[in-house]
Design a protein with these regions (language model features):
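A generic structural signal for short beta-strands and their flanking turns/coil linkers
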Residues: 1-3, 23-25, 41-43, 60-64
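Acidic surface patches and DE-rich sequence motifs
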Residues: 13-18, 33, 73, 87
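Structural detector for short beta-strands of small beta-barrel domains
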Residues: 1-24
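OB-fold and OB-like beta-barrel modules that bind single-stranded nucleic acids
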Residues: 5-9, 60-71
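Oligomerization/assembly interface segments of phage tail-like spikes and tubes
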Residues: 27-32, 66-70, 87
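OB-fold (S1/OB) nucleic-acid-binding surfaces
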Residues: 16-46
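OB-fold/S1-family single-stranded nucleic acid-binding modules
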Residues: 69-93
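Short nucleic-acid-contacting surface segments enriched for D/E, G, S/T with interspersed K/R
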Residues: 47-66
Length: 93
């Protein structure tokens, strides 16, 4: 599913996992679908290494389109898995 979202937070995230320290760049997204049928709760999305190089620190208060394959619980919040389809400039990746 494709979601047009507003990025409300763009931050580094660190935690200790099974294989040691894990460092990610995480954005918090609020669905802004123009149809009015929106997700009520904001969700987190972890940037891939390619996306991190391109977008880290540049998405705050911008709208992007994210292709979501699944929403999974992570630390009491929902975290999306997928890819950024179009960036804040409206161009496809």
């Amino acid at each position: 599913m494709q979601l047009k979202v507003l990025v409300t937070s763009d931050r580094p995230d660190e935690y200790v996992g099974k294989k040691g320290l894990v460092k990610n760049q995480v954005i918090t997204c609020q669905d802004v679908d123009p149809s009015g049928y929106r997700l009520l709760m904001p969700f987190d999305y972890t940037l891939s290494d390619d996306e991190k190089a391109k977008y880290a620190g540049k998405l705050l208060d911008k709208q992007v389109v994210i292709g979501v394959r699944e929403l999974v619980p992570f630390g009491g919040r929902l975290r999306a898995r997928g890819a950024i389809i179009s960036g804040p400039d409206g161009k496809n990746n």
